[in-house]
């Protein structure tokens, strides 16, 4: 070997390094990362807002101050009601075994999962039980095939196909990819087929697939009524999410699903502000560096006092519905579009008493073995469903007994009158109710509100118009945190990327 070769190689290496350093000095793409924001506001402490705060902390680091505003209780629509010293779920109640964000939260936050009650189910049409489960699997299969052919199997396969594509979102988010609209997120999961589900009614989708009117009326509609208080006129995507709620293995968080929100808030090291946000306005402020910068002034009320503070980034994680969060967006140019879509009223009633089983069948209570009764779309029916429930601390399935009063949960569109309660129960010891604007009223074709309302102003709850569920809100919270992080740092290559599934499936 030429003895001069090592020296020549070193000279070339030094020259190359010098050129690289010179290039990095002037090349604009290699500028230092932008300094993190000083303050971030999250409005709403439900599962969407608290998961967003959790992921914002992970992305932006320990120094940013995060304020989470909540006018009510942490948890939002995840809540419990007390029945004679025991707590029962009154809001979002069950979690699917494939809801990976919720599973991760429970594991990482030191919580425990309990299996949801899985008693026998019947369907009531106002006159009789048109379908009734047996405790024997083979008998259930025979009943379903006898009444509906193989439509239940076809429905299972249809839902499985949609869920299989839906699972792609976890891979995208694990690689930090974000989406600027709900439509782009859905398209990334399943292409035009997913958007088709979103823009057509479940009824139209399933009729085209050859499902019978009898199957739709007696099996599908009752599931929509218990989960979303609506019929098969909802969009096909939320219909699939609703049908997934009939899968085995559903679970909940021991102590109440709302514990996930309070633990996420703690883990994010956010500051909880108990107040009502009244307005958001873009302002220009001079920071410590002496340079003017755009910020958002959040005006909020605590008790009788009005306060304000300034934030670099704001995430709105509460429905922009005048009855739920009357936030005014002031002096934006162009004005921020108002989204006041209708939310469906729902009343949850918990009653401890002895069920009048003869309302649903001719059998006495000691011969009535159903744990849940769903209903068809009959205007004469005043309930969507009724079912036995367990306290949030217990891990067992309640079984009806003739000699013992049990706690039953009833979903209805309006508050039950005393006469209606006495029709459902032979006697009762205690009744408590909670009224909700629970989920959007679905009227496909849907138009989801924008996620990006302004430069650094984001809205999470638009995803509810695709489907409203705990896991959907957690996905929206993660997506909004990633979107805010990438837009703050100019990482446009991490937003709205096409063909992610094909690109990522080849990675190890």
Swiss-Prot record:
SUPFAM superfamilies: FAD/NAD(P)-binding domain. It holds the Pfam family NAD_binding_8. Glycans are attached at residues 199, 291, 356. It is found in: Lysosome. GO terms for molecular function: prenylcysteine oxidase activity. One of its GO terms (cellular component) is lysosome. It catalyses: an S-polyprenyl-L-cysteine + O2 + H2O = a polyprenal + L-cysteine + H2O2; S-(2E,6E)-farnesyl-L-cysteine + O2 + H2O = (2E,6E)-farnesal + L-cysteine + H2O2; [(2E,6E,10E)-geranylgeranyl]-L-cysteine + O2 + H2O = (2E,6E,10E)-geranylgeranial + L-cysteine + H2O2. Residues 1-31 form the signal peptide. Its EC number is 1.8.3.5. One of its GO terms (biological process) is prenylcysteine catabolic process. It is an enzyme of class 1 (oxidoreductase). The keyword Ribosomal protein does not apply. The keyword Amino-acid biosynthesis does not apply. Keywords: FAD, Flavoprotein, Glycoprotein, Lysosome, Oxidoreductase, Signal. It comes from the Eukaryota. Its cofactor is FAD. Belongs to the prenylcysteine oxidase family. Prenylcysteine oxidase that cleaves the thioether bond of prenyl-L-cysteines, such as farnesylcysteine and geranylgeranylcysteine. Only active against free prenylcysteines and not prenylcysteine residues within prenylated proteins or peptides. Involved in the final step in the degradation of prenylated proteins, by degrading prenylcysteines after the protein has been degraded. This is Prenylcysteine oxidase 1. It comes from Bos taurus. The lineage of its organism: Eukaryota, Metazoa, Chordata, Craniata, Vertebrata.
């Amino acid at each position: 070997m030429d003895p001069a070769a090592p020296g020549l190689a070193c000279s070339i290496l030094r020259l190359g390094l010098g050129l690289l350093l010179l290039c990095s000095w002037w090349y604009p793409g290699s500028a230092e990362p932008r300094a993190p924001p000083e303050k971030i506001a999250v409005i709403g402490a439900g599962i969407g807002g608290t998961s967003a705060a959790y992921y914002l902390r992970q992305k932006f680091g320990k120094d940013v101050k995060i304020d989470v505003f909540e006018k009510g209780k942490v948890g939002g629509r995840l809540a419990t009601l007390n029945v004679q010293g025991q707590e029962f779920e009154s809001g979002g109640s069950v979690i699917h075994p494939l809801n990976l964000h919720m599973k991760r939260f429970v594991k990482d936050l030191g919580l425990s999962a309990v299996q949801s009650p899985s008693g026998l189910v019947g369907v009531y049409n106002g006159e009789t039980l048109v379908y009734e489960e047996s405790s024997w699997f083979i008998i259930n299969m025979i009943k379903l095939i006898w009444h509906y052919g193989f439509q239940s199997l076809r429905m299972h396969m249809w839902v499985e196909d949609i869920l299989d594509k839906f699972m792609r979102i976890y891979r995208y988010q694990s690689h930090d990819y974000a989406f600027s609209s709900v439509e782009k997120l859905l398209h990334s999961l399943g292409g035009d087929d997913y958007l088709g589900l979103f823009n057509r009614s479940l009824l139209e989708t399933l009729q085209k697939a050859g499902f019978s009117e009898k199957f739709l009326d007696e099996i599908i509609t009752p599931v929509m009524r218990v989960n979303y208080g609506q019929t098969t006129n909802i969009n096909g995507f939320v219909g699939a999410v609703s049908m997934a709620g009939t899968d085995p293995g559903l679970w909940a968080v021991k102590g109440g699903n709302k514990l996930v929100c309070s633990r996420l808030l703690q883990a994010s090291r956010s500051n909880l502000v108990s107040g009502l946000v009244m307005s958001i306005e873009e302002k220009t402020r001079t920071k410590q560096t002496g340079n003017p910068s755009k910020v958002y002034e959040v005006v909020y009320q605590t008790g009788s006092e009005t306060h304000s503070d300034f934030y670099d980034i704001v995430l709105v994680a509460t429905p922009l519905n005048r009855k739920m969060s009357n936030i005014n967006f002031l002096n934006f140019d162009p004005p921020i579009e108002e989204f006041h879509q209708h939310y469906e009223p729902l009343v949850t009633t918990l009653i401890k008493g002895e069920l009048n089983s003869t309302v649903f069948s001719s059998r006495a209570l000691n011969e009535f073995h159903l744990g849940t009764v769903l209903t068809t779309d009959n205007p004469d029916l005043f309930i969507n469903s009724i079912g036995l429930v367990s306290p949030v601390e217990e891990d067992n399935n309640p079984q009806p007994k003739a000699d013992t009063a049990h706690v039953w949960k009833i979903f209805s569109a309006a508050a039950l009158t005393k006469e209606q309660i006495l029709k459902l129960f032979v006697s009762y010891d205690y009744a408590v109710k909670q009224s909700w604007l629970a989920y959007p009223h679905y009227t496909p074709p849907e138009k989801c509100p924008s996620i990006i309302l302004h430069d650094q102003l984001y809205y999470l709850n638009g995803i509810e118009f695709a489907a409203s569920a705990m896991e959907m809100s957690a996905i929206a919270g993660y997506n909004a945190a990633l979107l805010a992080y990438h837009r703050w740092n100019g990482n446009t290559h991490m937003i709205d990327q096409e063909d992610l599934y094909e690109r990522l499936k080849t990675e190890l």
